[in-house]
């Protein structure tokens, strides 16, 4: 045993009286105690020693504390070993930890943060001068005494810096406060005491924002992002709230390169901590804890107040008078037939694959335009494509084991089929993706079937001012599946492309049905019973088209958006509506007793369903939310049974534990104007992008966790007003481009030019001031090199370069005789909506295929994701209750 390690064998209760347990540390419980001889208070950590346990860790902590005597270090009193328990006695800090304090007071003031940072740096300067490092600096390990002194505690992970171990090749600490070189210890080869300075910067952000950066991420995901070469050091979110000195202090402490990061002595000379700072700042903080003034602290994730007007939680559909005649449009709704909606190649797939790698959408009122061959290539390869990710997992495994030992019970599941992120993180990129050149116009490679287009690029990059995003040095993604020339995907522009059904004979449907039948027999799928959804009944297998069917009469809600979801347990199909009054749902299996039920009481302007996860822009701050749909429905069902319900949605986040919450805010997404979701057909990755007031957030779907995770936050001055916001997938780029505008083309044969922000790039491309924006109402990427652009009364089908897609079988321009408000792409046509009706025009001939017009009604498309939902109100009373319709009647299968 170390000679400097003295250990008393006497009964510690002869010297100390335990008063109460005040917390649990890394290796044991902590008690408040009183010295029976002197009356002095002490903190005693009681550690139960297990057989075979590594005693060196405990010994290390005792040696560390005994050797350190400094005003900013918790004082060590002595140690006792009694039976199988070790008692470590140390100085008692009555003020508690900063983490406990800010949970009561809210964010610390800038001067209070400066004072705490200075005292912490003084303690670290002392430790580092003695050849030691702390390695776990965070708010929970910075304590205050009753008189406002700052003390560093918890040396359970401290380590001496000796000549033989100048860099610790170990991995211990809390991930969110961890320096990049610590996260990448296996690859970088170690770290030194400068990792403590990084933690000081993270702690400063924690005290200002009540949590460290990336705290919403799984610890393993946070580590993975920190090890990527394009990782950007975090910053304070609110630029205006804090001084330039504070921003610069955080920037210096969070210098990514440890060789350039200032040490404690250097950082103590920063103006942020050299300003006049007295202990009274900490005393004021303690007074606020002891006498909390709830009126002065408002959580900046404050929930919405209850609406002034009571909103019913259950809204029944009004019964139509039997004598009341149908409107002209409702009569036409039952007569005009529509082809199925077109499933875009860049549209995320909501279903989970079955064992054969196919999706069975028999439970949906939806139809795909993609061929079985396309699906085979995509999903058949999808199972094999995971193999390239299988690299060495030693770093993540060691990290996960260490996190588990340190109390992080949650971990990533070892999902062989879906855990892309964890496997990516173990790979070393051989060659980073090439940076694009920096001219005004950027060439984007085209598919070989677009040889007739010119080779001048036209997609422009808008500036990512402030902190341009860097491309990630990640393993190369698998090459996109190549379609055989004789069977290209739908909407291809070659002679061999599938013919879009501009006629009413259903030839395309029959063609694909025959292919499906052949494929199913080959797979022997015919013997497998299909899952059935409890919604509107499917039509017979003879293709008869679909029509609009009324599903609700007299809806009082001010609806913004709509989507649908199928409950995996009951197989019931639900429509989900986002409205001013909240999120509501309608069970299509109960249309005989139609009623809407409220799921979430806050204003909602955008909805999207991914598997069993509902994404929404909700609340008075227009923040992105993630909802667990089964949990949301279960909670709503339980609340209906209670005589008096306490809505969990209204409970503050800290009262309701995260694991019990069915709805959670996605951090860094407040004031979201628009959102879009896209799937990269080259990689299968799915992305969610949000347009905030002055920035863009990019999130990626993580399959094992079934949630979107933030991967990019790009500062960017948004156009005002922001008319359109879509993502465009381009070849050989990891992340999609973000299109924020469309201007008129300038190059030869160029009709439009896409104004984009490139999350993959380290450089900025500035939008030319003399490029006028066009009145674009809709942009959607149908295929890899096929984009539909809606301009006023015209729809143009272009490639990524903005040139018209020329084909003998497809029309590249569709013209309408009204101002287009919204569109839905059908199998054979584009269905355009205007104020008093809708009109469909053939992809092949630009001829009218369907038309419904009723000047007595005002129509509005509420959603076309999975199910087309339409709203209708009387023209002479636009504020009257609305009727709701869906496009239904297609066979629910591939």
From Swiss-Prot:
One of its GO terms (biological process) is protein phosphorylation. GO terms for molecular function: ATP binding; MAP kinase kinase kinase kinase activity; protein serine kinase activity; protein serine/threonine kinase activity. The modification Phosphoserine is found at residues 329, 398. CDD domains: STKc_MAP4K3_like. It catalyses: L-seryl-[protein] + ATP = O-phospho-L-seryl-[protein] + ADP + H(+); L-threonyl-[protein] + ATP = O-phospho-L-threonyl-[protein] + ADP + H(+). The modification N-acetylmethionine is found at residue 1. Residues 473-487 have a biased composition (Pro residues). Residues 556-867 form the CNH domain. Residues 340-353 have a biased composition (Basic and acidic residues). Residues 508-520 have a biased composition (Polar residues). Its cofactor is Mg(2+). It is an enzyme of class 2 (transferase). Keywords: Acetylation, ATP-binding, Kinase, Nucleotide-binding, Phosphoprotein, Serine/threonine-protein kinase, Transferase. ATP binds at residues 22-30, 45. SUPFAM superfamilies: Protein kinase-like (PK-like). Transmembrane segments: none annotated. Residues 16-273 form the Protein kinase domain. The active site is at residue 136. Its EC number is 2.7.11.1. It comes from the Eukaryota. Interacts with SH3GL2. Interaction appears to regulate MAP4K3-mediated JNK activation. This is Mitogen-activated protein kinase kinase kinase kinase 3. The lineage of its organism: Eukaryota, Metazoa, Chordata, Craniata, Vertebrata. The gene is Map4k3.
């Amino acid at each position: 045993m170390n000679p400097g390690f003295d250990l008393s064998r006497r009964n510690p209760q002869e010297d100390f009286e335990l008063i109460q347990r005040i917390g649990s540390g890394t290796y044991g419980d902590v008690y408040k105690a009183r010295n029976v001889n002197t009356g002095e208070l002490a903190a005693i950590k009681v550690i139960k020693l297990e057989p075979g346990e590594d005693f060196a860790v405990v010994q290390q902590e005792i040696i560390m504390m005994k050797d350190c005597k400094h005003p900013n270090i918790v004082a060590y009193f002595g140690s006792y070993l009694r039976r199988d328990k070790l008692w470590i006695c140390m100085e008692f800090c009555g003020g508690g930890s900063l983490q406990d304090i800010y949970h009561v007071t809210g964010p610390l003031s800038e001067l209070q943060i400066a004072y705490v940072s200075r005292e912490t740096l003084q303690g670290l300067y002392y430790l580092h001068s003695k050849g030691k490092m702390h390695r776990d600096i965070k708010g929970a390990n910075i304590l205050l005494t009753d008189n406002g002194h700052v003390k560093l505690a918890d040396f359970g992970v401290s380590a001496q810096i000796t000549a033989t171990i100048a860099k610790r090749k170990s991995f211990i600490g809390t991930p969110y406060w961890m320096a990049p070189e610590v996260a990448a210890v296996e690859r970088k080869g170690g770290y030194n005491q400068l990792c403590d300075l990084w933690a000081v910067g993270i702690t400063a952000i924690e005290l200002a924002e009540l949590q460290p950066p990336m705290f919403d991420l799984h610890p393993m995901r946070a580590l993975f992002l920190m090890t990527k070469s394009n990782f950007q050091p975090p910053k304070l979110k609110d630029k205006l709230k804090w001084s330039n000195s504070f921003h610069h202090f955080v920037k210096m402490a969070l210098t990514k390169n440890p060789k350039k990061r200032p040490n404690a002595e250097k950082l103590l000379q920063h103006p942020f901590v050299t300003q006049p700072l007295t202990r009274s700042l900490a005393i004021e903080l303690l007074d606020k804890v002891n006498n909390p003034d709830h009126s002065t602290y408002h959580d900046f994730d404050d929930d919405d107040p209850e609406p002034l007007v009571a909103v019913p939680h259950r809204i029944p559909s009004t019964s139509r008078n039997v004598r009341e005649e149908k409107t002209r449009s409702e009569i036409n709704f039952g007569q005009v037939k529509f082809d199925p909606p077109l499933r875009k190649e860049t549209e995320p797939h909501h279903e989970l694959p079955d064992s054969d790698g196919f999706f069975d959408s028999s439970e949906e009122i939806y139809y795909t335009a993609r061929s079985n061959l396309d699906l085979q290539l995509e999903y058949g390869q999808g199972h094999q494509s995971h193999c390239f990710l299988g690299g060495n997992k030693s770093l993540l495994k060691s990290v996960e084991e260490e996190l588990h030992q340190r109390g992080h019970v949650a971990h990533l599941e070892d999902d062989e089929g879906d855990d892309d992120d964890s496997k990516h993180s173990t790979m070393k990129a051989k060659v980073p993706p090439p940076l694009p050149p920096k001219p005004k116009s950027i060439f984007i490679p085209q598919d070989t079937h677009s040889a007739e287009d010119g080779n001048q690029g036209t997609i422009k990059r808008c500036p990512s001012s402030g902190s341009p995003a860097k491309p990630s040095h990640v393993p190369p993604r698998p090459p996109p599946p190549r379609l055989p020339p004789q069977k290209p995907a739908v909407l291809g522009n070659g002679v061999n492309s599938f013919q879009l059904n501009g006629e009413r004979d259903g030839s395309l449907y029959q063609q694909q049905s025959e292919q499906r039948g052949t494929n199913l027999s080959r797979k022997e799928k015919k013997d497998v019973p299909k899952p059935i959804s409890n919604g509107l009944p499917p039509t017979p297998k003879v293709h008869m088209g679909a029509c609009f069917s009324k599903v609700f009469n007299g809806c009082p809600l001010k609806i913004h958006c709509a989507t649908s979801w199928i409950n995996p347990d009951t197989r019931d199909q639900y429509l989900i509506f986002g409205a001013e009054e909240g999120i509501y749902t309608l069970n299509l299996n109960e249309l005989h007793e139609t009623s809407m039920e409220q799921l979430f009481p806050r204003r909602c302007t955008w909805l999207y369903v991914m598997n069993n996860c509902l994404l929404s822009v909700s609340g008075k701050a227009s923040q992105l939310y993630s909802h667990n749909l089964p949990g949301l429905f279960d909670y709503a069902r339980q609340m209906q049974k209670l005589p008096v319900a306490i809505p969990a949605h209204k409970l503050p986040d800290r009262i309701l534990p995260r694991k019990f919450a069915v709805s959670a805010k996605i951090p860094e997404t407040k004031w979201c104007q628009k959102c879009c979701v896209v799937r990269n057909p080259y990689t299968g990755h799915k992305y969610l992008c949000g347009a905030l007031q002055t920035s863009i957030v990019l999130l990626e779907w993580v399959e094992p966790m079934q949630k979107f995770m933030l991967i990019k936050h790009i500062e960017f001055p948004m156009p005002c007003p922001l008319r359109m916001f879509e993502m465009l997938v381009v070849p050989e780029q990891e992340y999609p481009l973000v299109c924020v505008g469309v201007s008129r083309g300038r190059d030869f044969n160029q009709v439009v030019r896409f104004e984009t922000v490139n999350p993959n790039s380290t450089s900025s491309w500035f939008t030319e001031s003399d490029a006028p924006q066009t009145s674009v109402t809709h942009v959607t990427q149908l295929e890899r090199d096929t984009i539909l652009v809606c301009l006023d009364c015209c729809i143009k089908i272009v490639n990524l370069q903005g040139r018209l897609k020329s084909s003998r079988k497809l029309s590249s321009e569709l013209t309408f005789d009204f101002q287009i408000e919204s569109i839905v792409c059908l199998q054979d046509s584009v269905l355009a909506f205007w104020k008093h009706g809708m009109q469909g025009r053939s992809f092949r001939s630009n001829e009218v295929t369907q038309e419904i017009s009723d000047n007595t009604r005002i129509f509005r498309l509420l959603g076309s994701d999975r199910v087309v939902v339409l709203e209708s109100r009387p023209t002479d009373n636009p504020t009257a209750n609305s009727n709701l319709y869906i496009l239904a009647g297609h066979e629910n299968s591939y």
